[in-house]
A protein has these predicted regions:
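Compact, glycine-rich, soluble single-domain proteins
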Residues: 51-60, 64-74, 91-92
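Catalytic strand-loop segment that frames the active site of acyl-thioester-processing enzymes
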Residues: 18-59
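Short, conserved beta-turn/loop elements at beta-strand boundaries and strand-helix junctions
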Residues: 31-34, 117-122
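Hydrophobic beta-strand-centered segment that forms part of the acyl-chain substrate-binding groove
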Residues: 2-5, 72-116
Length: 123
């Protein structure tokens, strides 16, 4: 199976998020309606590092959760593009999420999302 990969410009066509609240640079390993991997480089210039935490910057956990949500939204929007045109995909649930280490500036983060179940238009 080929590795389907989409870039930032294609992601912008799929989800409504924009800078400074777009936390997805690339989507790879896409299996429609099943799974994908999101990639983001958190550069030292991210706006939230100024206050979280001064002198010891760390990516806030809620930003990492948002990255997961955007990865999932991009997966679903990519998978059913015609049905989601001009619609927003919402995060409904997160299971088995653990933050094992802090994420520091200039770190590349990968987030794997799996669509475990769906009911109608809810995944």
């Amino acid at each position: 199976m080929p590795n389907i990969k989409i870039n930032l410009n294609e992601i912008r066509e799929l989800i409504p998020h924009r800078e400074p609240f777009l936390f997805l640079d690339e989507l790879t390993d896409i299996i429609k309606l099943k799974k994908a991997t999101g990639k983001k480089i958190f550069s030292k210039d991210e706006y939230f590092f100024k206050g979280h935490f001064p002198g010891q910057p760390v990516v806030p956990g809620v930003i990492l959760v948002e990255m997961m949500a955007q990865t999932a939204a991009a997966l679903i929007a990519y998978s059913i593009r015609e049905e989601t045109f001009d619609k927003i995909v919402y995060l409904m649930n997160i299971e088995n999420t653990k933050f094992r280490k802090p994420v520091f500036p200039d770190t590349i983060i990968f987030t794997d999302v799996n669509a475990l179940r769906s009911k109608g238009r809810v995944w």
